[in-house]
């Protein structure tokens, strides 16, 4: 085995076990977004996750951890300007703890329509504006923005991860949970 890849919104759960993982190559993707409990009901608050991100980065190294700002949804409460402002604050906080930020925009799947009916696809113009500005902000803080590999089925390469109806965070934008009762 060359590498274990981790994707999480809550790295705190793994911190007590890091000594067991040190013999292995690792790469961590930690999703941190500024949404509140109305969108991400069971995700720890952003400040706590950023603190744990820093601890994890100190353990694995800046080149073995990436920040996911994902998904980007634009609506009346989460405007383009709001995302730019929040991203700037977050990038400043994470400066020196990662060199990579992966972004993606919300995908409107049927499960997303059911859980977040007000969600709309982000317009091409808003995607361009957000992408351009986030790239500039990230560069200012020593990070490179990369897009998520959306639309590519990479399962044949061992990249497809996760299982449906298993995540207890219950984010409104998530396509992986069809039935909340199955998760519980």
Locations of regions flagged by a protein language model:
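Conserved AdoMet/S-adenosylmethionine-binding subsite of the radical SAM
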Residues: 1-119, 123-126, 130-134
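Electropositive, surface-exposed helix/loop patches at the edges of structured domains
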Residues: 108-110, 140, 163
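A C-terminal junction/extension of Radical SAM enzymes
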Residues: 114, 125-154
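N-terminal [4Fe-4S]-dependent radical SAM core
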Residues: 150-164, 184
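Local cysteine-cluster metal-coordination motifs and their immediate loop/turn environment
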Residues: 162-178
